Amino acid sequence: MNLVFGMIASIGELLIDLISVEEGDLKDVRLFEKHPGGAPANVAVGVSRLGVKSSLISKVGNDPFGEYLIEELSKENVDTRGIVKDEKKHTGIVFVQLKGASPSFLLYDDVAYFNMTLNDINWDIVEEAKIVNFGSVILARNPSRETVMKVIKKIKGSSLIAFDVNLRLDLWRGQEEEMIKVLEESIKLADIVKASEEEVLYLENQGVEVKGSMLTAITLGPKGCRLIKNETVVDVPSYNVNPLDTTGAGDAFMAALLVGILKLKGLDLLKLGKFANLVAALSTQKRGAWSTPRKDELLKYKEAREVLAP
């Protein structure tokens, strides 16, 4: 498969992040900032900012927040043809609590992106994509779970499939056995799997092997990342920065990882890891989930030039 100059499509949740301005419990916080969010949307924006054609397939409500999200994606040069408006369900909203080392989330599930059906899928986008990216959140409810899994199974072998574990246990409360089955199936379908160190430990304790058929990327927080291809394991140290907001760091990492796979000749794990770590670190210097730095900001770094420079 010739990946150069291809398009990366993401499928899944597009929502509003309401991020607490001050640290503390949600019940005590008074002020929130509105930001666009949803892991696949964050990745789609990151891919576009890194100079690669990017599309998002999702569903929002026919409401002001839905309009806002589509407008913001368009400003980021993300193809929005795959975003459908739901006449019955509202646009998703997530409250983000900044407390301690990493944010926590309060997410509601009776929303538009969990109501995706096969009739909502733009197959022109799916068939054009060299890489199709999805995560676990969209799989937590039907009909979206069935829809996304059918899409992924249909394109298996014709496009690279990337899966971000992105585990949100609260969403699966009362259906833990089903969650394990869904995650295991998704991992087995994926060529590229990304997970945090904590997610890997959790799933391995449940008997699930976290391994992409082509590449496995494990984020290690302040320690950097571990990339695994077949029997080759490369640990790549992180960049030392003072984080302002880590909300979108994992998604920035994923965007950089996918762009690197698309652009690098041969899968150079060290170059790929350095680039993804750099992008993730710089993303923590901005507030909000759409914090991936732009290509022109990155070209002053050798690690970025090795991937992004023509």
Curated annotation (Swiss-Prot):
This is Putative sugar kinase PH1459. Its EC number is 2.7.1.-. One of its GO terms (molecular function) is ATP binding. PANTHER family: HEXOKINASE FAMILY MEMBER, PSEUDOURIDINE KINASE-RELATED. Gene3D superfamilies: 3.40.1190.20. One of its GO terms (biological process) is fructose metabolic process. Keywords: ATP-binding, Kinase, Nucleotide-binding, Transferase. Belongs to the carbohydrate kinase PfkB family. ATP binds at residues 194, 219, 224. Disulfide bonds: none annotated. It holds the Pfam family PfkB. It comes from Pyrococcus horikoshii (strain ATCC 700860 / DSM 12428 / JCM 9974 / NBRC 100139 / OT-3).
